[in-house]
């Protein structure tokens, strides 16, 4: 059997299993203290499951999933669909650090709209010269700066999805270390190419992508994962940034630096798990 994913909402996990049953794919739900794990019986069906899982994660409340439960008869189980609350879902799948960073980014973004980008960057941007090196918050605070609504929405969506599961499964301390280290190195990498005029959480997000994906591949028992299709999309997005296909100003060096840091940290943290499975 292959572990597919861990989901904090047991009812939604069962809905996905029921839906895949209509596609003639046998999955098994294993409840745990933080929700449920979904396991696949036939390894050869993994690519199909990963593809469907990507669609499910984008829209887990789509009526087709509940309809599948009706079709399978599993609505008679003690797993009722509760009234959906975005706030409840947001909180249930994120720890205190995940939520705190989201609130901080939103507060800083609002402040930037009020007083202007320049005023906020003068306090929070990457150190301009050695006179600012001792203002140690600058080595990390640049990650909380966002310059458009699309910029902050995209980053916070990924942050919530990746940091949330990491904090829930591996603890706040592990997430804090990765956040600080990746913010430091991604900021340093970007400063070599663009000076200090940059900001955003994307370097940290790419570190999370690398960490969560590789940890899921090498140590699935730790309960965090990123589907390979989403990881491939993220890499393609990174490559597109270098060729300016999308016409956006993208901090490519921060993305690459963050991704490398995340992969290296995951490789180190899973070195013993990899040896055990060999």
UniProtKB/Swiss-Prot annotation:
Q: What is its main location?
A: membrane
- Please give the organism: Yersinia enterocolitica serotype O:8 / biotype 1B (strain NCTC 13174 / 8081)
Q: What is this protein called?
A: Rhomboid protease GlpG
- Where is the protein localized? Cell inner membrane
By sequence similarity, the record places it as follows: Belongs to the peptidase S54 family.
GO molecular function terms here?
Answer: serine-type endopeptidase activity
Is Protease among the key words of this record? yes
Annotated function: Rhomboid-type serine protease that catalyzes intramembrane proteolysis.
List the InterPro entries: GlpG_N_sf (IPR038236), Peptidase_S54_GlpG_N (IPR022732), Peptidase_S54_rhomboid_dom (IPR022764), Rhomboid-like_sf (IPR035952), Rhomboid_protease_GlpG (IPR023662)
The domain of life for this entry's organism is Bacteria
Q: Keyword set for this entry? A: Cell inner membrane, Cell membrane, Hydrolase, Membrane, Protease, Serine protease, Transmembrane, Transmembrane helix
Gene symbol of the encoding locus? glpG
Record lineage:
Bacteria, Pseudomonadati, Pseudomonadota, Gammaproteobacteria, Enterobacterales
């Amino acid at each position: 059997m292959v572990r597919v994913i861990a989901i904090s909402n047991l009812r939604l996990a069962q809905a996905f299993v029921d839906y895949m049953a209509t596609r003639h794919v046998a999955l098994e739900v294993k409840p745990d203290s933080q929700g449920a794990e979904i396991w696949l019986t036939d390894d050869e069906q993994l690519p199909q499951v990963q593809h469907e899982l990507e669609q499910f994660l984008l829209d887990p409340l789509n009526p087709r999933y509940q309809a599948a439960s009706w079709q399978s008869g599993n609505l008679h189980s003690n797993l009722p669909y509760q009234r959906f609350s975005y706030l409840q879902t947001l909180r249930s799948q994120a720890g205190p650090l995940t939520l705190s960073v989201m609130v901080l980014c939103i507060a800083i973004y609002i402040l930037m709209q009020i007083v202007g980008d320049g005023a906020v960057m003068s306090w929070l941007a990457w150190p301009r010269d050695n006179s600012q090196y001792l203002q140690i918050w600058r080595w990390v605070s640049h990650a909380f700066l966002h310059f458009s609504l699309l910029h902050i929405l995209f980053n916070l969506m990924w942050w919530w999805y990746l940091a949330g599961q990491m904090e829930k499964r591996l603890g706040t301390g592990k997430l804090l270390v990765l956040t600080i280290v990746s913010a430091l190195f991604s900021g340093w990498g970007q400063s070599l190419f663009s000076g200090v005029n940059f900001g955003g959480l994307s370097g940290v997000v790419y570190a999370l992508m690398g960490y969560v994906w590789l940890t899921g591949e090498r140590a699935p028992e730790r309960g965090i994962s990123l589907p390979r299709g989403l990881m491939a999309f993220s890499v393609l997005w990174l490559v597109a940034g270098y060729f300016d296909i999308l016409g956006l100003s993208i901090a490519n060096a921060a993305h690459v630096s963050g991704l490398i840091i995340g992969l290296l940290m995951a490789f180190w943290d899973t070195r013993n798990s990899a040896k055990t499975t060999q």
